[in-house]
Protein backbone atom coordinates (compact mmCIF):
# COMPACT_ATOMS: atom_id res chain seq x y z
CA UNK A 1 0.00 0.00 0.00
CA UNK A 2 0.96 3.59 -0.53
CA UNK A 3 1.48 6.04 2.29
CA UNK A 4 -1.07 8.83 1.97
CA UNK A 5 -1.75 12.13 3.64
CA UNK A 6 -5.18 13.16 4.79
CA UNK A 7 -6.54 16.32 6.35
CA UNK A 8 -8.43 16.48 9.62
CA UNK A 9 -10.16 19.15 11.70
CA UNK A 10 -11.02 18.90 15.36
CA UNK A 11 -14.14 21.06 15.43
CA UNK A 12 -15.06 23.80 17.95
CA UNK A 13 -17.21 21.57 20.16
CA UNK A 14 -14.43 19.01 20.67
CA UNK A 15 -11.87 21.78 21.30
CA UNK A 16 -14.21 23.42 23.85
CA UNK A 17 -14.78 20.05 25.52
CA UNK A 18 -11.00 19.58 25.88
CA UNK A 19 -10.97 16.45 23.69
CA UNK A 20 -7.91 17.34 21.58
CA UNK A 21 -5.49 15.06 23.43
CA UNK A 22 -7.88 12.12 23.45
CA UNK A 23 -8.50 12.48 19.72
CA UNK A 24 -4.77 12.76 18.98
CA UNK A 25 -4.16 9.64 21.06
CA UNK A 26 -6.73 7.78 18.96
CA UNK A 27 -5.00 8.91 15.74
CA UNK A 28 -1.64 7.72 17.01
CA UNK A 29 -2.95 4.41 18.36
CA UNK A 30 -4.45 3.80 14.92
CA UNK A 31 -1.01 4.18 13.36
CA UNK A 32 -1.25 7.72 12.02
CA UNK A 33 1.67 10.11 12.20
CA UNK A 34 0.60 13.69 12.89
CA UNK A 35 2.92 15.55 10.53
CA UNK A 36 1.43 19.05 10.82
CA UNK A 37 -0.85 20.69 13.35
CA UNK A 38 -2.08 24.11 14.41
CA UNK A 39 -4.91 25.74 16.32
CA UNK A 40 -6.74 28.66 14.78
CA UNK A 41 -10.04 30.46 14.68
CA UNK A 42 -11.64 30.56 11.24
CA UNK A 43 -12.95 33.82 9.87
CA UNK A 44 -16.30 33.70 8.11
CA UNK A 45 -14.49 34.11 4.78
CA UNK A 46 -12.14 31.20 5.52
CA UNK A 47 -15.02 28.93 6.54
CA UNK A 48 -17.09 29.87 3.49
CA UNK A 49 -14.08 29.22 1.25
CA UNK A 50 -13.28 25.88 2.84
CA UNK A 51 -16.88 24.67 2.60
CA UNK A 52 -17.61 26.36 -0.77
CA UNK A 53 -18.79 23.07 -2.31
CA UNK A 54 -21.73 23.13 0.14
CA UNK A 55 -22.81 26.72 -0.62
CA UNK A 56 -26.54 26.81 -1.36
CA UNK A 57 -27.32 23.72 0.70
CA UNK A 58 -29.71 24.13 3.63
CA UNK A 59 -27.03 23.42 6.25
CA UNK A 60 -24.35 25.78 4.84
CA UNK A 61 -25.04 28.87 6.97
CA UNK A 62 -25.30 26.85 10.18
CA UNK A 63 -22.08 25.01 9.37
CA UNK A 64 -20.19 28.25 8.74
CA UNK A 65 -21.62 29.76 11.93
CA UNK A 66 -20.57 26.71 13.94
CA UNK A 67 -17.09 26.47 12.43
CA UNK A 68 -16.41 30.13 13.30
CA UNK A 69 -17.81 29.84 16.84
CA UNK A 70 -14.53 28.89 18.48
CA UNK A 71 -11.02 27.60 17.88
CA UNK A 72 -10.38 24.53 15.74
CA UNK A 73 -7.32 22.31 15.40
CA UNK A 74 -6.25 21.37 11.89
CA UNK A 75 -3.82 18.57 11.21
CA UNK A 76 -2.24 16.50 8.48
CA UNK A 77 -2.21 12.78 9.14
CA UNK A 78 0.04 10.31 7.35
CA UNK A 79 -0.38 6.54 7.07
CA UNK A 80 -1.05 3.80 4.57
CA UNK A 81 -4.54 4.25 3.12
CA UNK A 82 -4.87 7.35 5.34
CA UNK A 83 -8.03 8.82 3.81
CA UNK A 84 -10.19 5.73 4.24
CA UNK A 85 -8.68 4.75 7.59
CA UNK A 86 -9.41 8.20 9.00
CA UNK A 87 -12.97 8.06 7.70
CA UNK A 88 -13.40 4.68 9.43
CA UNK A 89 -12.06 6.07 12.73
CA UNK A 90 -14.31 9.16 12.50
CA UNK A 91 -17.52 7.20 11.96
CA UNK A 92 -20.69 8.27 10.19
CA UNK A 93 -21.24 12.01 9.65
CA UNK A 94 -24.45 11.78 11.68
CA UNK A 95 -23.29 10.72 15.14
CA UNK A 96 -26.61 8.92 15.68
CA UNK A 97 -25.45 6.49 12.98
CA UNK A 98 -21.80 6.28 14.07
CA UNK A 99 -20.54 2.95 15.35
CA UNK A 100 -19.55 2.72 19.01
CA UNK A 101 -15.90 3.53 19.51
CA UNK A 102 -15.65 5.96 16.59
CA UNK A 103 -14.67 9.58 17.18
CA UNK A 104 -18.11 10.90 16.33
CA UNK A 105 -19.87 8.37 18.53
CA UNK A 106 -17.60 9.35 21.42
CA UNK A 107 -17.13 13.12 20.97
CA UNK A 108 -19.94 14.56 18.81
CA UNK A 109 -22.66 16.75 20.30
CA UNK A 110 -24.95 16.86 17.24
CA UNK A 111 -25.03 16.43 13.46
CA UNK A 112 -23.28 19.78 12.91
CA UNK A 113 -21.15 19.63 16.05
CA UNK A 114 -19.86 16.20 15.09
CA UNK A 115 -16.36 16.70 16.55
CA UNK A 116 -14.20 16.05 13.49
CA UNK A 117 -13.85 16.58 9.75
CA UNK A 118 -11.79 14.37 7.47
CA UNK A 119 -11.04 14.44 3.77
CA UNK A 120 -13.23 12.17 1.64
CA UNK A 121 -10.68 11.46 -1.12
CA UNK A 122 -6.97 11.84 -1.83
CA UNK A 123 -7.71 14.77 -4.15
CA UNK A 124 -9.77 16.62 -1.56
CA UNK A 125 -7.07 15.90 1.05
CA UNK A 126 -4.49 17.61 -1.15
CA UNK A 127 -6.76 20.64 -1.64
CA UNK A 128 -7.69 20.86 2.05
CA UNK A 129 -4.09 20.48 3.23
CA UNK A 130 -3.00 23.29 0.89
CA UNK A 131 -5.84 25.49 2.21
CA UNK A 132 -4.31 25.51 5.71
CA UNK A 133 -0.64 24.54 5.39
CA UNK A 134 2.33 25.35 3.22
CA UNK A 135 4.89 22.61 2.56
CA UNK A 136 7.39 24.04 5.07
CA UNK A 137 4.87 23.41 7.88
CA UNK A 138 4.53 19.70 7.05
CA UNK A 139 7.15 17.44 8.60
CA UNK A 140 7.06 13.85 7.38
CA UNK A 141 8.82 11.58 9.84
Swiss-Prot record:
Homotetramer. The active site is at residue 117. It catalyses: a 2'-deoxyribonucleoside 5'-diphosphate + ATP = a 2'-deoxyribonucleoside 5'-triphosphate + ADP; a ribonucleoside 5'-diphosphate + ATP = a ribonucleoside 5'-triphosphate + ADP. Belongs to the NDK family. InterPro entries: NDK-like_dom, NDK-like_dom_sf, Nucleoside_diP_kinase, Nucleoside_diP_kinase_AS. It comes from Serratia proteamaculans (strain 568). Major role in the synthesis of nucleoside triphosphates other than ATP. The ATP gamma phosphate is transferred to the NDP beta phosphate via a ping-pong mechanism, using a phosphorylated active-site intermediate. SUPFAM superfamilies: Nucleoside diphosphate kinase, NDK (SSF54919). This is Nucleoside diphosphate kinase. It is found in: Cytoplasm. It comes from the Bacteria. ATP binds at residues 11, 59, 87, 93, 104, 114. Its EC number is 2.7.4.6. Its main location: cytoplasm. GO terms for biological process: CTP biosynthetic process; GTP biosynthetic process; UTP biosynthetic process. Its cofactor is Mg(2+).
Amino acid sequence: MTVERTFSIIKPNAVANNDIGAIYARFERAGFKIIASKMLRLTREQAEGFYAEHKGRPFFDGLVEFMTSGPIVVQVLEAENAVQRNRDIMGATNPDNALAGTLRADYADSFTANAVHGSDAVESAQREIAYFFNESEICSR
